[in-house]
Amino acid sequence: MLLLINSANCQVAGFAVATVGWILTTTSMGLVEWRVWYIENNALMPPGLVCVGMWKVCVYHHVSDHNRVTLCQRYSYRDPNLPLDIRVSQNLLLIASILGLLGRASIIFALRNAYLGILRENATFNPFVASGILNLASGVCIAVTVVWNYHSVMSEHGISFPPSLSIPFKPNTQEIGSAFLVACLAAFMMLLSGVIFLSHKFSTAIQVHPQTSDM
């Protein structure tokens, strides 16, 4: 009993990491600064800044030193103008958010059982392990999105936006934005929480069933 409660106390740290990671995941989904395009003199639009997100794009035109015009337009998975990497990343981020939410629910259930003394080490279903697997899967989904976005920016891939936005296919220069960094941190924390849940479970199992030396 005491061993299980001590194990649960250690898992609280993993739960906190997973919670922050899940919050960062959902935050990165709503941010538009996944890719930052810098547009200089162009026939389609005046000099400005274009921020490309996973679900919308925003165009910023500087009218003066203190004023700027912002135009944002949302797009969906079925938008034919979207490249494959953005369409796949939309699904990966949604899956990561759902898996992270399920992982949090599983660890809450596990902590409740541990503190009530009804969690068994030899149970067929261990919510600690389930939470670790879910968080690892969530972290992998986010990591794939991050790597793919980074590759697209470094390779200077273009995007065919609707003509109404008057955005060129490729900018003069482009770079990764703040949403990329938020997603990187989210992926790290989700993976870390998954490792914490799984590794501590295995270390607890070793303590419960120690190896005995031959006499």
PLM features per residue range, with description:
Residues 1-8, 49, 73-91, 122-125, ...:
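Juxtamembrane membrane-interface segments at transmembrane-helix boundaries in membrane proteins
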Residues 32-90:
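A surface-exposed beta-alpha-beta supersecondary segment
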Residues 41-44, 122-125, 158-161:
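Short amphipathic alpha-helical segments embedded in low-complexity Lys/Glu-rich regions
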Residues 2-35, 86-153, 183-204:
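Signature of small four-pass
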Residues 44, 117-120, 168:
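Short helix-coil transition/hinge motifs at the ends and kinks of transmembrane helices
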Residues 48, 203-215:
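Intrinsically disordered cytoplasmic terminal tails of membrane proteins
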Residues 68-82, 156, 192-204:
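Alpha-helical membrane-embedding segments
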Residues 67-72, 113, 154-165:
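Peri-membrane helix termini and adjoining interfacial loops of integral membrane proteins
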